[in-house]
């Protein structure tokens, strides 16, 4: 048996990003999806904390899924009842988020079933996969990471989330 040679990432190299994020700052439409809002907040938070808080407040008032996504990510009292790891699902093929069948903006009402035991496990998992297949590809990739407690946004932390949504339990 041959031994594996250590040809992984070189020492000192940056960690591999958890997912590909938007890196260009742009003006968001009024009906922006959660992924776009959090990517822009991530960019702005690196420059100015207060502007990021105001942006999250502004878009969080229009899209209820922003607050619930951040709460699921940062609240220690919320534990996912879904299996850990990458979910096997078929990625939505629509090129733009506004062409997808649905969005987290509408599907966030189902989050309560993924963190409680109200629904049998098989039904809960099928609901999760159906939701991931219906929402835009980047949103489904993001929420699949959030389910496991992995923060894909390096500049968004619990301090920023609480500043934007003071009634959030973190």
Where are these regions (language model features)?
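N-terminal nucleic-acid-engaging modules of covalent nucleotidyltransferase systems
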Residues: 2-170
């Amino acid at each position: 048996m041959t031994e594996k040679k250590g040809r992984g990432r070189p020492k000192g190299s940056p960690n591999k990003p958890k997912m590909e994020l938007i890196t260009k700052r742009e003006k968001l439409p009024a009906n922006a999806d959660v992924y776009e809002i959090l990517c822009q907040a991530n960019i702005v938070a690196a420059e100015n904390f207060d502007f990021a808080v105001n942006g999250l407040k502004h878009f969080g008032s229009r899209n209820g899924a922003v607050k619930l996504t951040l709460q699921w990510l940062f609240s220690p009292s919320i534990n996912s009842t879904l299996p850990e790891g990458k979910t096997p699902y078929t990625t939505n093929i629509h090129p733009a988020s506004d062409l997808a069948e649905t969005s987290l903006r509408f599907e966030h009402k189902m989050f309560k079933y993924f963190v409680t035991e109200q629904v049998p496990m098989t039904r809960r998992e099928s609901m999760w996969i159906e939701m991931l297949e219906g929402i835009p590809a980047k949103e489904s990739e993001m929420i699949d990471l959030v389910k496991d407690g992995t923060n894909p946004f390096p500049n968004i932390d619990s301090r920023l989330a609480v500043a934007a949504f003071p009634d959030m339990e973190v």
